[in-house]
């Protein structure tokens, strides 16, 4: 793993960097590209340590500013008053310079890589982003994640294939991927990912199984949350511009799911 990332998450993030510029940038911060950067730093540090120190100071001075700073707090009114006082004292020590937006010029590229480690198991990821194919995102994405993850991939990758986990990753920004965890296979797992197309083409669960997947879908968006989790959700929605109206739209689209709509997604899988 890299920077504390779990291996299967590292595989997924690398996959996303093939088609999404934001994920490509993230590789430089915590992924395999970051690992390569650290290796280069270590290799050349003895030759010019001061140059590296100067670069770190420059980065630190750039990011430690109150410009566009957003703080999140979850707690009581009394705790907030204390937080406000402490945070304001901290903010006084930050810079006030404006941060200029920088263009990200590292283009995405499909690499289809494999990375060898000392482990005798694999973490296999394959996917894409459906919006690049002109397929819009809606609540059906969340329902498909439940159907593919709890039924097809669970049975084919985990039960039949022997992996510790077989997961469907389908996000509200259009990412669609198959992901395995502690998997003894590679080629077989990739073939099972491809088999999702046929599975969806022939999708026809019983009414009870269909409702089970419907309930499983809602458990991911309407589950009980702790105060800290509510704060994390609010923080994420703020920066991704996900409104409560959009969340309700997803709910309505999930409730409108039918076997016919599921089968209609087969060509894009």
Summary of predicted features, one role per range:
Residues 55-59, 86, 143, 153, ...:
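Short, hydrophobic/aromatic alpha-helical segments in well-folded domains
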Residues 70-125, 130:
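An aromatic/glycine/proline-enriched structural segment found at the starts
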Residues 150:
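Acidic/histidine-rich
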């Amino acid at each position: 793993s890299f920077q504390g990332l779990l291996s299967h998450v590292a595989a997924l993030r690398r996959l996303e960097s093939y088609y999404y510029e934001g994920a490509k940038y993230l590789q430089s911060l915590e992924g395999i590209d970051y690992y390569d950067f650290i290796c280069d730093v270590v290799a050349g540090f003895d030759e010019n340590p001061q140059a590296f120190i100067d670069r770190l100071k420059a980065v630190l001075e750039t990011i430690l500013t109150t410009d566009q700073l957003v703080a999140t707090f979850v707690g009581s009114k009394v705790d907030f008053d204390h937080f406000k006082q402490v945070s304001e004292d901290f903010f006084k020590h930050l810079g006030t310079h404006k941060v200029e937006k920088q263009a990200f010029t590292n283009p995405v590229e499909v690499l289809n890589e494999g990375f060898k480690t000392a482990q005798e198991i694999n973490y296999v990821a394959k996917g894409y982003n459906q919006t690049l194919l002109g397929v819009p995102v809606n609540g059906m994405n969340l329902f498909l994640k439940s159907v593919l993850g709890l039924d097809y991939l669970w049975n084919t990758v985990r039960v039949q294939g022997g992996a510790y986990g077989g997961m469907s990753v389908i996000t509200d920004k259009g990412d669609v991927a198959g992901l395995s965890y502690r998997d003894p296979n590679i080629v077989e797992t990739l073939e099972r990912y491809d088999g999702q197309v046929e599975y969806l083409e022939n999708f026809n669960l019983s009414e009870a199984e269909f409702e089970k997947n419907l309930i499983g879908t809602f458990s991911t968006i309407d589950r009980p949350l702790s105060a800290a989790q509510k704060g994390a959700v609010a923080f994420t929605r703020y920066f991704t511009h996900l409104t409560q109206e959009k969340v309700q739209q997803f709910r309505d689209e999930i409730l409108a799911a039918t076997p016919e709509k599921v089968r209609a997604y087969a060509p894009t899988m």
